Amino acid sequence: VNRPTPTPPTRLLAIDAGLRAGLAVYTADGRLERYRSTNFGAPSRLKKGVYGVMSAVEGLRRVVVEGGGPVADPWAREAHRRGLSLQRVQAGVWRKALLLPRDRRTGRDAKEQADEIAREVIAWSGAPRPTSLRHDAAEAILIGLWGVLDAGWLPELPESLQPG
């Protein structure tokens, strides 16, 4: 009996690009599945590591990267090579969508607020709770949240995640 192979669930990978990068994976229902911080340590290891990170995300369809230049370009190249939807976003864009103006006055304020909201996203999504949460992972979580909203995977921010 030939049974159709089930298609893997669609996923989005969000990256706070850097040699120390934050990574977050979201499912098509707009919920955070997993997140982490990784230290590539050197540009050569970043270039090699991008392939493995993307290969580990089953059903990857969309990539959202914050950052530019040599730390973001390997992510863009690999996404294009795989035929994935790629979106680059600047911090100011996702912060404006997810943080109140008072929480965006300084980069430090924004990072503190990102950490708080990331923990709320983790709880709302039912993702494993962090023992510690690095700011790059927290920012990747919010980059991904912005990405699923932008893609229409979530029609709007869940009430518990709305600023204010």
PLM features: residue spans?
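Phosphate- and other anionic-substrate recognition elements at nucleic-acid/protein interfaces
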Residues: 1-164
